[in-house]
Amino acid sequence: NDKGVWKVYSDILNADVLIASAVGHLVEKDNPYKNYENWELENLPALPEKFSYKVKKGVSYSFNNIKKCIRECDFIIIGTDPDREGESIAYKILNEIPGSINKVKYRLWANSLTKKGIESAFKKLRDPSETINYYHEADARDDADWLVGFNLSPFVTIKMKEVGELEKTDKVMSVGRVQTPIVSLIVRNHEEIENFVSVPFWTIEALNEEGLKFTNDVKYKSLQEATEALELMSDSYTVIDVKVENKSQTAPKLYNLTNLQSEMSKLYKVDATRTKEIVQSLYQKGFMSYPRTDSTLITTNEFEYLVANIERYKQTIGKDIETVNLIPRKEFVNDKKVVEHYAIIPTENIPNIEELDSYEKIIYQMVTFQTLLMFSENYDYQSTTITIKNDASSVEFKVSGNVTINKGWRKYKQTKSEDKELPSLNVADNLVLKANIKQDQTKPPSRITEQYLLKTLLPKYDLGTS
């Protein structure tokens, strides 16, 4: 290590190698309107024909290290993080160093920072043309974010002050490509709750002597309307349909970043940013695969090393899970669908779990446990739906229930039980039931939580998911 540059000999490349770290973004946009007052409406919109860049303050030493290495080397291997941001970091630096782009020969694409993972990536160096579009995507997004912020933040702020929505002279309404739609969804949700007026409604249900409840979906607007419907019914019912299905449910999907963030928010009240930082830390320590992924699948390569380490994983997290599915299944393993990054899984580099900090330990256990469930048996159950009709009024009622045949992975992961024993009935069977009226109220929408935002809203509107 010579002042931030590592000099090594690579057996794989059969060459001397200089390694220089970018320590994140070294280059940033240079404001094209340094003396431009964008807080005056007549100066908007501001649409530069081209953006220029400059080296950020405080990182010139790292930039010059890279520049010196590039001058000395025969060719360049880009080894930044394998994603849009990593690609952007690399090319923005290279664009500021004359002649460097022509020296780019390979792209290192490492989803794991274990020794084996890095060696494997070096043996499969990619052509830069395969990944450069990630840079173009990141660059286009960066330009769009700048244009939105530089133009719409002052425009919206000025307009809101004109109508008295922003009283303080120094207050600014920030506008962003992702943040503004999210704020809009939260405000809309808040207004729906604030303006919600609960309305009563009535339903009719029919019960047998054991208290088994058959329900009807009709909601009556008044007690009188429900009473009139009830008066048309008799106590006699006929079974008109019995649907029995044997079903099998595989274990939950492997984690991607969003699902892991959602679960950490739900179970431990840890926000999305903190979760990402913790997983990134585990990745950098070589214990976890690449974190910024939206995939819930792995390839056969990962499956094979996971199988080889099953017992070590069990011992590390203290879970005696019965692992019987040792052949890849399409719900978890698909070489064709894993384009760049696979799901978040433990690497073959297994830590002493007691040496991890508290949240690193929690996340490592969660990810490893979810991975082990992939090898467990399916949850098998029998699903039954019985439909009956009132003999006098022809109104239909239904009841559904599941009966567990084999708990499988549910032996290890607690879930809300849906088991409900139903009587053995056949079509045309006659029943005697007691119908009654039940009153209820319409309920306001639930508040948007971080978990709901991450798991449902962001994917639904494709916000901040790439």
Predicted regions and their residues:
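Extended, highly charged linker/hinge segments and catalytic-adjacent loops that couple domains
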Residues: 131, 135-136, 145-151, 157, ...
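Intrinsically disordered, low-complexity regulatory segments
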Residues: 1-150
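Long, highly charged, low-complexity internal segments
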Residues: 12-56, 165, 169-280, 284, ...
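C-terminal or mid-to-C-terminal helical accessory/interaction module adjacent to the motor/catalytic core
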Residues: 51, 58, 64-72, 113-208, ...
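Short, conserved phosphate-binding/catalytic loop or strand-edge motifs used
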Residues: 111-117, 161, 257-258, 278-288
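Short glycine-centered, acidic/aromatic-flanked micro-motifs in structured strand/loop junctions
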Residues: 80-82, 262, 292
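A generic secondary-structure signal for well-formed alpha-helical elements
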Residues: 96-101, 126, 151, 155, ...
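GHKL-family ATPase ATP-binding module
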Residues: 1, 291, 325, 379-383, ...
